[in-house]
């Protein structure tokens, strides 16, 4: 039985090789990607206002899709900080490697679409979800935790 199925699918594939091409041409222009669809990556800060990132560039090196770009800046005291931190949301595959490899826990990720993940926040403040303010408040809170 398996052999006949294999043989049938082989002939179907062989037949489709000689049929005219039906590939749809994709548009060249870039599509708009909403940041709230799959979440936001952002740097966290200490309560005193200093950023946690020490610009070790481990996140930049471990990213499989090369979505991060971190450039090192030096302060007057000789401390390193991230002078330039950019994330390409078109390249990011949301694997989370950058969050797990960070030694200072500087990169965090908002929890995708919050209305599905956080039922208590939806029950306590449904009007914030209607206007989209809940995402901004929660992201601002995570930034300083």
UniProtKB/Swiss-Prot annotation:
Positions bound to [4Fe-4S] cluster 1: 53, 56, 59, 102
Domain 4Fe-4S ferredoxin-type, chain residue ranges per copy: 43-73, 83-112
Reactions performed catalytically: a ubiquinone + NADH + 5 H(+)(in) = a ubiquinol + NAD(+) + 4 H(+)(out)
Keywords in alphabetical order: 4Fe-4S, Electron transport, Iron, Iron-sulfur, Metal-binding, Mitochondrion, NAD, Oxidoreductase, Repeat, Respiratory chain, Translocase, Transport, Ubiquinone
Molecular-function GO terms, alphabetical: 4 iron, 4 sulfur cluster binding; metal ion binding; NADH dehydrogenase (ubiquinone) activity
Signal peptide positions (record): none
UniProt KW Cell wall biogenesis/degradation keyword: no
Pfam families: Fer4_7 (PF12838)
Family: Belongs to the complex I 23 kDa subunit family.
Primary role: Core subunit of the mitochondrial membrane respiratory chain NADH dehydrogenase (Complex I) that is believed to belong to the minimal assembly required for catalysis. Complex I functions in the transfer of electrons from NADH to the respiratory chain. The immediate electron acceptor for the enzyme is believed to be ubiquinone. May donate electrons to ubiquinone.
Record's protein name: NADH-ubiquinone oxidoreductase subunit 8
Top-level taxonomy: Eukaryota, Discoba, Euglenozoa, Kinetoplastea, Metakinetoplastina
């Amino acid at each position: 039985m398996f052999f006949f199925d294999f043989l049938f699918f082989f002939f179907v594939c062989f037949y489709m090789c000689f049929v005219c091409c039906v590939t749809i041409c994709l548009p060249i222009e870039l599509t708009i990607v909403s940041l709230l669809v799959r979440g936001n990556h952002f740097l966290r800060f200490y309560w005193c206002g200093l950023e946690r990132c020490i610009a070790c560039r481990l996140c930049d090196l471990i990213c499989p899709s090369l979505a991060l770009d971190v450039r090192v800046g030096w302060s007057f005291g000789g401390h390193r900080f991230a002078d330039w931190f950019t994330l390409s949301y078109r390249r990011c595959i949301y694997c989370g490697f950058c969050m797990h490899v960070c030694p200072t826990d500087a990169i965090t990720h908002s929890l995708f679409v919050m209305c599905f993940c956080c039922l208590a926040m939806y029950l306590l403040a449904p009007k914030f979800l209607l206007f989209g303010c809940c995402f901004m408040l929660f992201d601002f809170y995570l930034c300083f935790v």
